[in-house]
């Protein structure tokens, strides 16, 4: 690849959360990482009928659950929005990015209700749900704009980018 990185794609469904299937996903993730590859996880839309029935795919929660299964330190959700704003940035020019969320409060959930992404169907509310899953699993989560891959460098250099949801309430 252009960056000399190997990736492996995992196509999963919500049924990975069943106890008898978790171990298979954990083993696959561990093996991918042992081989020095980067796991790329997505919902398997070809077999997931829930998406058709609900008219909404939900990769954010799936990613959070996989992060918990993998005992990850951090989950990065890349979107076309910079992170969580104090109000919908598509409607309000004065919307301000919230850089750190130490606790997911009802106010945070209410703010997220109106700030959707134009990519995918989950919007910000599903990203907050994913942040809750991560927090319960002891994992930090960052929501950031993924249109520029150089943004990842800021994460790796511990520079602020997007919105950081902390697992333990500390930065």
Please annotate each region the language model reported.
Residues 1-171:
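C-terminal catalytic "cap/lid" subdomain
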């Amino acid at each position: 690849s252009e960056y000399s990185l190997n990736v492996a794609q995992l196509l999963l469904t919500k049924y990975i959360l069943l106890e008898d299937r978790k171990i298979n996903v954990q083993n696959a993730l561990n093996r991918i990482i042992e081989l020095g590859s980067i796991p790329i996880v997505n919902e398997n839309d070809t077999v997931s009928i829930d998406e058709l029935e609900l008219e909404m795919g939900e990769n954010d929660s799936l990613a959070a659950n996989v992060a918990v299964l993998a005992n990850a330190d951090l989950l990065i959700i890349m979107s076309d929005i910079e992170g969580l704003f104090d109000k919908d940035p598509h409607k309000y020019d004065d919307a301000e990015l919230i850089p750190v969320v130490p606790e997911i409060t009802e106010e945070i959930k209410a703010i997220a209700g109106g700030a959707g992404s134009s990519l995918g169907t989950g919007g910000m509310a599903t990203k907050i749900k994913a942040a809750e899953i991560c927090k319960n699993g002891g994992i930090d989560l960052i929501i950031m704009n993924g249109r520029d891959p150089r943004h990842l460098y800021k994460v790796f250099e511990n520079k602020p980018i997007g919105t950081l949801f902390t697992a333990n309430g500390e930065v």
